[in-house]
């Protein structure tokens, strides 16, 4: 009896501490719950250094709502994980939250039942300052090289960890940006090499959401840069938007555009529901791979790929994404229940958006007429691009050859001469108009023109013959003129 009375004050004190902690909405990190192991290694973060992050939404326009929603969601996860605002650099056009079509002005959601993810996100680089050049300068920590924006850069030191997340449209060897030129694989990899040579980070993890995103790293990503990369798709397939109107699950009825991207929501929803001090990068990779493949069916799904230094994936995710104390007692990573969700090819998401805008507009209204015109011009410009590339191939190689669609063996880069690729893209756009986000799918064709030794002069002649009658004036609504991609 005496022994029981002796322990009662201690139990009472513990209960008071737990009630106090719970009343604050979370448990204090210093108070270990019975289900949490007291692992000194997990508690001691002195050797981690500073966590840095670069978040890039590479698109603009309300039809691309999902990319900025993805990036804002990622920002909220990192902030909950303890990363400081001063250590997170955000590049996004910032034309969605307050867009006239946004049914909830000043907010963005990334899930049908999700909360606002826009509030508090810093406007480091917006509008015309969202450029490939600024992205490279930010990553290199070169404050003198950035133009416009907040001037914030990744001023990392040798013991620091860096997380890079990009979401947008892409194509073979290229990642889109709202202001051209785009991010080309060779330039991106060269930037990573420079960052490594500067000795200003310990390790880096990169997540890329884009069509053909594997082609950015295939055959050219070194393994000795202390960088681990995963991509939403391999080098020759699309990635997918999700949480789209008319699909399951569907966004709230007032939304006419997709809220997220399949690979992106897969990693973020995984991070939010697991203790990142216990979950490894490898575990998240396999979870995201399973979900992004639509559970190994690849029916509306893509192949998540990995590149670079694979030894990094044995590390815990908190080294890059931080640790949210609210997740302290969540279970170790388990594969989610196999529940396929509706998706749309990234390149068709804008058509889906235009269709729903047309469908929901009042009959006989100016808005309905304008939307139909934009939808018509968009599809017409797509047909023009496809037909032009096909005709150029016929002129250069003959009608029976399929040279421009050839895919190289795994492990080989898209093209041997990246400057040649840029040159061929520029020639095409000068004669045939902007590739737009849809036309980036033809980058492999231009790469194969280079790989087959075609000169710039021959490409000029073929493009002139194929597009001699092209007129920009035919496209008064569709944004076919967006500057040169290269």
Swiss-Prot record:
InterPro entries, alphabetized: AE (IPR043577), Legum_prodom (IPR048501), Legumain_prodom_sf (IPR046427), Peptidase_C13 (IPR001096)
GO molecular function: cysteine-type endopeptidase activity
Tissue expression from the record: Seed specific. Also expressed in the flowers and buds.
Source taxonomy: Eukaryota, Viridiplantae, Streptophyta, Embryophyta, Tracheophyta
Annotated function: Asparagine-specific endopeptidase involved in the processing of vacuolar seed protein precursors into the mature forms. Probably involved in post-translational proteolysis of seed storage proteins in the protein storage vacuole of developing seeds.
Annotated positions for site Required for post-translational maturation and enzyme activity: 258
Family the entry assigns: Belongs to the peptidase C13 family.
PANTHER family recorded: HEMOGLOBINASE FAMILY MEMBER, LEGUMAIN
Protein name as catalogued: Vacuolar-processing enzyme beta-isozyme
Principal EC category: hydrolase
Signal sequence, renumbered to the chain: 1-21
Compartment list: Vacuole; Protein storage vacuole
GO BP, sorted A to Z: proteolysis involved in protein catabolic process; vacuolar protein processing
Catalytic-site annotation from UniProt: 169, 211 (nucleophile)
Pfam families: Legum_prodom, Peptidase_C13
Residues listed as glycosylation sites in the UniProt record: 309
PTM comment: Auto-catalytic activation.
One GO cellular component term: protein storage vacuole
Disulfide linkage: 244-258, 420-450, 432-467
EC number: 3.4.22.34
This protein's encoding gene: bVPE
Reactions mediated catalytically: Hydrolysis of proteins and small molecule substrates at -Asn-|-Xaa- bonds
Phenotype seen when the gene is deleted: No macroscopic phenotype, probably due to functional redundancy. Slight differences in polypeptide accumulation in seeds with an increased amount of propolypeptide forms of legumin-type globulins. In plants lacking all vacuolar-processing enzyme isozymes (e.g. alpha, beta, gamma and delta) shift of storage protein accumulation from normally processed polypeptides to a finite number of prominent alternatively processed polypeptides cleaved at sites other than the conserved Asn residues targeted by VPE.
Record keywords: Disulfide bond, Glycoprotein, Hydrolase, Protease, Signal, Thiol protease, Vacuole
